[in-house]
């Protein structure tokens, strides 16, 4: 990472107008937030904000759940899901951007240097009826390099773009004030 900070990035133009980015980070992991800030600085991404994540691994999150605690989710999945909903809600309350980029604090931007396109080119290629476009996946061995409909093994919440309409729909469906309603059969795959 030290090399990343000291080198001049001749590919930074590829992420021009990338954002707003909402980076989800646990309070107890400041080193991961520093890592993300280093990447954003290296790539000259300045439209980003940290979202304090809910930690479901050790904490009982029943105080932020409205209704029945979801039985088909682990506590970590509840923390992840509610953190993403919190980020979406914050985006809707603080920005008028037509889209937001949701990114977790372990997402690497290293491969951007190999892009033969710019962010604005990719964004222009989104289908007219898009809701969410996944920018990072958990690699299961098959890598699809073209924009495509979701495959069964393409899952991850590491980094995705969500449009305002879809974020509004998810927040309307799952947020009740400062609480989250997840008893409608939600089963994340992250």
Q: What positions do the PLM features span?
A:
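An acidic/histidine-cluster motif and surrounding catalytic segment
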Residues: 1-103, 107-190
């Amino acid at each position: 990472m030290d090399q990343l900070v000291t080198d001049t990035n001749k590919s930074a133009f590829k992420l021009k107008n990338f954002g707003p980015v909402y980076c989800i980070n646990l309070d107890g992991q400041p080193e991961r937030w520093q890592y993300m800030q280093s990447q954003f600085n290296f790539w000259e991404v300045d439209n980003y904000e940290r979202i304090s994540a809910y930690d479901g691994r050790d904490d009982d999150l029943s105080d932020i759940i409205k209704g029945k605690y979801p039985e088909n989710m682990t506590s970590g999945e509840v923390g992840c899901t509610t953190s993403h909903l919190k980020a979406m809600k914050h985006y809707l309350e603080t920005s008028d951007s037509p889209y937001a980029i949701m990114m977790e604090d372990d997402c690497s931007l290293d491969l951007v240097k190999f892009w033969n396109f710019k962010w604005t080119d990719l964004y222009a290629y989104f289908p007219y009826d898009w809701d969410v476009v996944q920018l990072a996946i958990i690699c299961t061995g098959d890598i699809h390099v073209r924009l495509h409909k979701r495959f069964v093994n393409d899952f991850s919440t590491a980094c995705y773009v969500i449009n305002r309409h879809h974020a509004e729909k998810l927040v309307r469906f799952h947020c009740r004030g400062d609480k989250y309603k997840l008893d409608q059969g939600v089963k994340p795959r992250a």
